[in-house]
């Protein structure tokens, strides 16, 4: 998808792997480049599920948006498609039928988080990003940080949603439903709704109460304890390294 035309080269070059040099002339939207991108996208879509309406990434999918930008309105190529069993942990759902082998999740897991759970397996058509020996992610060293989900451009990785369970609990008159929020939640809400740098605690609590929660608690105190404990641990490690 990221191919470009470099003056003086016979073949198209992948922009993500091409090193810039002084005086290089790069063309990004020539007819040849656009046609190549369309062909690559059509091949990707030929091995991709057609369940956009029910996909968790519908409306927020990079693959969907790129296909629209390229003007693709039909899938020209038909043939065998890959089939993988869905896998999930307490936090993450893996639907590898939707994996396009961009390998962003692998980079996030190995190079950013240094966990090393995800890597590319197989070659050619059956290639996919998976766990070692294709073990269920629940049995691996996954720390459920969610960074792989955050960078996934398709619905191959998504959050294991508990919204339906929460709504059922709220609707049950025999249950008292309690919600506990971390300090980061109100900060994130403030950024998402245009209140960056301002407290939205009151708005958040009001919204949760209107949803039907009986009690709303804040984890400020326990967060402070965590910071103190981790700070003490860091000082201990630094002193040990220096001493």
Where do the language-model regions lie?
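Iron-sulfur-associated redox domains of electron-transfer enzymes in respiratory
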Residues: 1-37, 41, 45, 159-243
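Fe-S ferredoxin-like electron-transfer domains
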Residues: 4-144, 150, 157-158, 162-172, ...
């Amino acid at each position: 998808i990221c191919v470009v035309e470099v003056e003086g080269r016979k073949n198209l070059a992948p922009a993500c792997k091409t090193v810039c040099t002084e005086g290089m002339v790069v063309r990004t939207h020539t007819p040849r480049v656009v046609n190549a991108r369309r062909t690559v996208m059509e091949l990707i879509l030929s091995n991709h599920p057609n369940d956009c309406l029910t996909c968790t990434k519908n409306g927020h999918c990079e693959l969907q948006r790129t296909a629209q930008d390229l003007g693709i309105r039909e899938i020209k190529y038909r043939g065998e498609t890959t089939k993988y069993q869905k896998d999930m942990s307490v936090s993450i759902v893996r639907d590898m039928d939707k994996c396009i082998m961009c390998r962003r999740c692998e980079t996030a897991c190995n190079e950013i988080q240094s966990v090393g759970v995800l890597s590319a397996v197989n070659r050619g058509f059956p290639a996919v990003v998976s766990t070692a020996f294709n073990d269920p992610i629940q049995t691996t060293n996954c720390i459920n940080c969610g960074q792989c989900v955050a960078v996934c451009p398709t619905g191959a990785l998504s959050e294991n949603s508990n919204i339906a369970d929460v709504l059922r609990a709220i609707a049950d008159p025999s249950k008292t439903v309690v919600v506990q929020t971390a300090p980061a939640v109100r900060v994130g809400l403030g950024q998402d709704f245009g209140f960056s740098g301002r407290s939205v605690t009151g708005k958040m609590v009001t919204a949760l109460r209107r949803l039907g929660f009986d009690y709303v608690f804040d984890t400020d105190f326990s967060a402070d304890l965590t910071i103190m404990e981790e700070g003490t641990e860091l000082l201990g490690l630094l002193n040990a390294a220096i001493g």
